[in-house]
Amino acid sequence: MSRKCAISGKGPMVGNNVSHAKNRTRRRFLPNIRTVRVTLEDGTTTKLRISAKELRTLKKHS
């Protein structure tokens, strides 16, 4: 199961941990993925793994 939003396709990004001494080590920034149950237009419900931002967008427009 990938860490990817089913709607926006948002996935992990890579960057650096930077210490106080400016030492840099690689790290991953993971999206805030939530599993939610969504009711579709035809009345059926399905589970989606979507990011928290897309969940807010869904709540706003539905």
UniProtKB/Swiss-Prot annotation:
Keywords: Ribonucleoprotein, Ribosomal protein. NCBIfam families: L28. This is Large ribosomal subunit protein bL28. It comes from Aliarcobacter butzleri (strain RM4018) (Arcobacter butzleri). The gene is rpmB. The lineage of its organism: Bacteria, Pseudomonadati, Campylobacterota, Epsilonproteobacteria, Campylobacterales. GO terms for cellular component: ribonucleoprotein complex; ribosome. The keyword Ribosomal protein applies. Disulfide bonds: none annotated. Gene3D superfamilies: 2.20.150.30, Ribosomal protein L28/L24 (2.30.170.40). InterPro entries: Bacterial_rp_bL28, Ribosomal_bL28, Ribosomal_bL28/bL31-like_sf, Ribosomal_bL28_bact-type, Ribosomal_bL28_sf.
